[in-house]
Amino acid sequence: MAKATTIKEALARWEEKTSQKPSEAREIKLYAQIPPIEKMDASLSTLSNCEKLSLSTNCIEKIANLNGLKNLRILSLGRNNIKNLNGLEAVGDTLEELWISYNFIEKLKGIHVMKKLKILYMSNNLVKDWAEFVKLAELPCLEDLVFVGNPLEEKHSAEGNWVEEATKRVPKLKKLDGTPVIKEDEEEDN
């Protein structure tokens, strides 16, 4: 089997293709590398101007080495092999959007550090307990959540009470699974 692509190699390819210096670029796309990236290695720390980083559709197992990304606002890690959210603390003060659907995340430990997170797309993961889901209420700015395809959502959607139960536990949500959230008290005002 082919050896994994390193971040350094992927950045060199990206630089060649775009004629931009990775250290100066605001948006860097390293998705769907062949062979796939397996590790978020220390080369990421050179991306000091990066505001949007896409590493989706690779084989990354751990979130790591984000400490140099002082301006990161959008991180795309969908379709990888990520099992937990450890490693996000380095971008806790800047990250506004986390796209992490189609991974293997069961627990939301570590999510509370995301002080500015407004958008969380984490469909098709493995979250099955309300005890984990309620950790999302600790995010002061979270407004838009996509959670479809997690065992918890599937169970409660089948029972017909997903939206009601989810918005009760995370009341600040304005959008859930792509649909605007309509609050009971707002309906009465009309």
UniProtKB/Swiss-Prot annotation:
Q: Which organism is it from?
A: Bos taurus
Record-annotated LRRCT domain positions: 150-190
An annotated GO cellular component: microtubule
Family membership, please give it: Belongs to the dynein light chain LC1-type family.
User: Per its database record, what is this protein's job?
Assistant: Part of the multisubunit axonemal ATPase complexes that generate the force for cilia motility and govern beat frequency. Component of the outer arm dynein (ODA). May be involved in a mechanosensory feedback mechanism controlling ODA activity based on external conformational cues by tethering the outer arm dynein heavy chain (DNAH5) to the microtubule within the axoneme. Important for ciliary function in the airways and for the function of the cilia that produce the nodal flow essential for the determination of the left-right asymmetry.
Which UniProt key words apply to this protein?
Acetylation, Cell projection, Cytoplasm, Cytoskeleton, Dynein, Leucine-rich repeat, Microtubule, Motor protein, Phosphoprotein, Repeat
Annotated Pfam families? LRR_4 (PF12799)
Q: Subunit composition?
A: Interacts with ZMYND10 (via C-terminus). Interacts with DNAH5, a outer arm dynein heavy chain. Interacts with tubulin located within the A-tubule of the outer doublets in a ATP-independent manner.
User: At which residues is Phosphoserine found?
Assistant: S56
Q: What is this protein called?
A: Dynein axonemal light chain 1
* Sites bearing N-acetylalanine, chain numbering: A2
Q: What else is known?
A: Outer (ODAs) and inner (IDAs) dynein arms contain the molecular motors that generate the force to move cilia by ATP-dependent reactions. There are two mechanosensory systems that monitor and respond to the mechanical state (curvature) of the axoneme. One system involves the central pair microtubule complex and radial spokes and the second system involves the outer dynein arms.
